[in-house]
């Protein structure tokens, strides 16, 4: 009977630098809104569409800057109106993977807690176009979409803008 012997693992010849994650920027929304990217023309429909179909589990107000909508993880998140992506990344710790879209009327919509982002900064998007997949990134204990509407950088109640 023969016995197989294993060779010790080879030792690396050089040391890799340790990974340093990018710094989180507390002013991501403000900086993105200051970007001068031009949004495409609005659809003219008047009201924005809901970015997902789900159950609203948290409403605007009382310290909440938007609404939280419960949806299964991986649900397509769609642009509420034509616009241009002014931010797509994970620099907002509480929201994790987040997309910000500026619209022709100056409003900015925020889509947080995505499991993946399907667009990039500077990209023009159409109403109803998939921009992300819902998830649990950031600080959340269940899959959802955090959705905000901002006017002049200040959060406003999304219900007045949605059809």
Which residues are covered by each model-predicted region?
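Short aromatic-glycine-enriched beta-strand elements
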Residues: 93-100, 143-145
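Short histidine-centered loop motifs in beta-beta connectors
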Residues: 72, 88, 104-128
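Surface-exposed, glycine-biased beta-strand/turn segments
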Residues: 2-95
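Solvent-exposed coil/turn segments that connect beta secondary-structure elements
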Residues: 61-63, 72-74, 82, 90-91, ...
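A residue-level detector for short acidic-glycine micro-motifs
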Residues: 58, 71, 87, 113-116, ...
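Small beta-strand-rich domains/subdomains or short beta-sheet motifs embedded
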Residues: 49, 70, 77-80, 111-112, ...
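Conserved, short, structured surface segments that act as functional micro-motifs
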Residues: 123-163
């Amino acid at each position: 009977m023969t016995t197989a012997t294993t060779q010790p693992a080879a030792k690396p010849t050089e040391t890799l630098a340790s990974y340093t994650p990018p710094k989180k920027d507390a002013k991501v929304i403000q900086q993105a809104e200051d970007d001068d990217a031009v949004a495409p023309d609005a659809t003219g429909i008047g009201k924005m569409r809901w970015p997902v179909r789900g159950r609203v589990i948290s409403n605007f107000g009382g310290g909440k800057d938007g609404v939280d909508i419960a949806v299964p993880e991986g649900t397509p998140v769609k642009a509420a109106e034509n616009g241009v992506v002014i931010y797509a990344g994970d620099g907002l710790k509480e929201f994790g993977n987040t997309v910000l879209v500026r619209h022709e009327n100056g409003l900015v919509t925020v889509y947080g807690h995505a499991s993946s982002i399907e667009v990039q900064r500077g990209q023009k998007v159409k109403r109803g176009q998939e921009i992300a997949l819902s998830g649990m990134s950031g600080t959340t204990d269940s899959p959802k979409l955090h959705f905000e509407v901002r006017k002049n950088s200040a959060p406003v109640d999304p219900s007045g803008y949605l059809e």
